[in-house]
Amino acid sequence: MELNNLKPAEGAKHAKRRVGRGIGSGLGKTAGRGHKGQKSRSGGFHKVGFEGGQMPLQRRLPKRGFTSLTKEFVGEVRLGDLEKLPVDEIDLLALKQAGLVGELIKSAKIIATGELKRKIVVKGLGATKGARAAIEAAGGSFAE
């Protein structure tokens, strides 16, 4: 086998179907478009979702929910991540410096994932009920 002798396997390549090129091709006359109707005409198309004048599905269904504008500015921090921090007083600035939340975050909440075994003081951060219980059980406290 040499690079200049490589070729596709027998039957691997097929010629493209040429539509509208005579009755013998099997795709002559109407070229696979059928008879009459909008889709058989040149330039005949409709918008995505158009249902022939019937109210489209995306307009029949009610609007629901909304996009929160504050979502991207609120961060979540796990208890397990707080365990690894070298500081005992934890506030938003300490979380940003440790890289646990992004620079754009304006408020953060501690969630009860992982374990906390050391005493910490939390300042100006929210916490779930489970996280608050775990921090207080480890001897920690919340300073608002």
UniProtKB/Swiss-Prot annotation:
Annotated Gene Ontology cellular component terms: cytosolic large ribosomal subunit
Lineage: Bacteria, Pseudomonadati, Pseudomonadota, Betaproteobacteria, Burkholderiales
Record-level Gene Ontology MF annotations: rRNA binding; structural constituent of ribosome
UniProt keyword annotation of Ribosomal protein present: yes
Similarity remark: Belongs to the universal ribosomal protein uL15 family.
Pfam families in UniProt: Ribosomal_L27A
Top-level lineage group: Bacteria
UniProt function note: Binds to the 23S rRNA.
Assembly behavior: Part of the 50S ribosomal subunit.
Gly residues bias (residue ranges): 21-31
Protein name: Large ribosomal subunit protein uL15
